[in-house]
């Protein structure tokens, strides 16, 4: 089965479980074609088809509740029940009992691709070593939350914008096509509310 067949099969399956917007799939296909990293992000179904044959030893590792579609952009921050800023994995839509190696190999592959495409300034082998070291240390330490206010001042600075420039994000956001214009009544209400906030 080639990638086109695998994608059609996956999207047919998906349409049987959720409402699929055809134009969104077209956009997804365009993004997938832009580079290898975006392709990896969008094709977990294909990864699962090929991984057992390409990495048979890793595929026979013990099973855990894995993230599945793990890659370097599936990390972020949120507030926990106590209001603390926590950093970690933030995408669980494809979590499933799988060999634990799936997450490690996929995360390492994504880091390697991100480096190759200039998205990360690391030596690929160092990125892979850091992933393995972090995973091992996390197991040894009991998997405590990564609370930024406690032991991670540099990461906290990055995610609280002191070292991060949001300009690129907003430029990309503004470049997205308008799917449906905001109704005039809603726009008027927003402008009135914004005006009140500045008084």
Question: Which residue stretches match the model-derived regions?
Answer:
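Catalytic or ion-translocation cores adjacent to nucleophile or general acid/base/metal-coordination motifs
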Residues: 101-110
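Hydrophobic residue at the +6 position relative to the catalytic HRD Asp in the kinase catalytic loop
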Residues: 70-77
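Acidic active-site catalytic centers that drive phospho-/nucleotidyl reactions
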Residues: 69, 91-93, 103
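Regulatory N- and C-terminal appendages and interdomain linkers associated
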Residues: 1-65, 80-90, 96-98, 112-198
């Amino acid at each position: 089965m080639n990638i086109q067949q695998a994608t059609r099969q996956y999207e047919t399956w998906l349409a049987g479980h959720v409402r699929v917007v055809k134009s969104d799939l077209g956009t997804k296909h365009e993004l997938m074609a832009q580079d290898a990293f975006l392709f990896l992000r969008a094709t977990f179904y294909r990864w699962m088809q090929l991984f057992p044959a390409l990495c048979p030893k890793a595929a026979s590792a013990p099973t855990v509740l894995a993230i599945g579609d793990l890659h370097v952009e599936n990390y972020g921050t949120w507030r926990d029940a106590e209001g603390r800023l926590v950093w970690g994995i933030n995408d669980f839509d494809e979590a499933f009992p799988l060999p634990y190696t799936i997450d490690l190999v996929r995360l390492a592959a994504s880091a390697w691709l991100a480096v190759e495409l200039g998205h990360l300034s690391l030596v690929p082998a160092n990125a892979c070593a850091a992933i393995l070291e972090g995973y091992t240390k996390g197991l040894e330490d009991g998997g405590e939350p990564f609370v930024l206010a406690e032991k991670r001042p540099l990461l906290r600075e990055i995610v609280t914008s002191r070292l991060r420039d949001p300009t690129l994000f907003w430029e990309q956001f503004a470049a997205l096509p308008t799917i449906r214009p905001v109704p005039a009544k809603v726009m008027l209400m927003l402008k009135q509310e914004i005006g009140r906030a500045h008084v």
